[in-house]
A protein has these predicted regions:
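FNR-like FAD-binding dehydrogenase module
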Residues: 1-169
Length: 169
């Protein structure tokens, strides 16, 4: 998930001596974070360009803010190029922030299908902008797996060209 990438980024920035705070986009308020030296938004896009639930209200707050904060902003979009609205929410966040005059920390970029390599490439660019060596070695946490034993199997519908199987484990 995007939160896993955020945890990797938080850990790497902390190890590089940076002060870091991570929160869901729904909790982000530009006025409350006025003292931040920089802001980094990791934004996933779902379905037809929809925002994740954790981003509720973010665009409204960005659109209502007066000129952008002094802290430069980086937006990294997460999505799947197999969908027509690839990273559309992240692009919208980027566009609204730039329209408000928010300075760019690093150019807008995207990560396709949770690619650790693309994330690491973006991390090197971010590190260069910050003047630090930043190695983002993201290792996704795999879900727990369980071995199942097949007890029985019943097949139906093959003669009607609608095969169905009932499996009992």
């Amino acid at each position: 998930s995007t939160w896993g990438f955020a945890a990797t980024l938080l850990e790497a920035l902390t190890e590089a001596g940076q002060r870091v705070h991570a929160a869901p986009m729904s909790a982000f308020d530009p006025a409350r974070h006025a003292s931040a030296k920089r802001v980094i938004i990791l934004a996933a896009t779902y379905g037809d360009g929809d925002a994740p639930a954790s981003a509720r209200g973010l665009l409204d707050r960005l659109e209502r803010m007066e000129p952008g904060p002094a802290a430069p902003l980086a937006v990294l979009g997460f999505g799947d190029r197999g969908f027509p609205a690839y990273c559309a929410f992240a692009e919208t966040v980027e566009r609204v922030a730039r329209a408000k005059g928010w300075a760019e920390l690093v150019p807008f970029d995207t990560v396709d299908r949770q690619s650790s390599q693309e994330f690491a490439r973006w991390g090197r660019a971010l590190g260069a902008a910050l003047g630090i060596d930043l190695d983002l070695a993201h290792q996704p946490v795999l879900p727990a797996a369980e071995t199942l034993t097949l007890v029985s199997r019943r097949d139906y519908g093959a003669e009607a060209q609608a095969p169905t199987a009932i499996l009992r484990f």
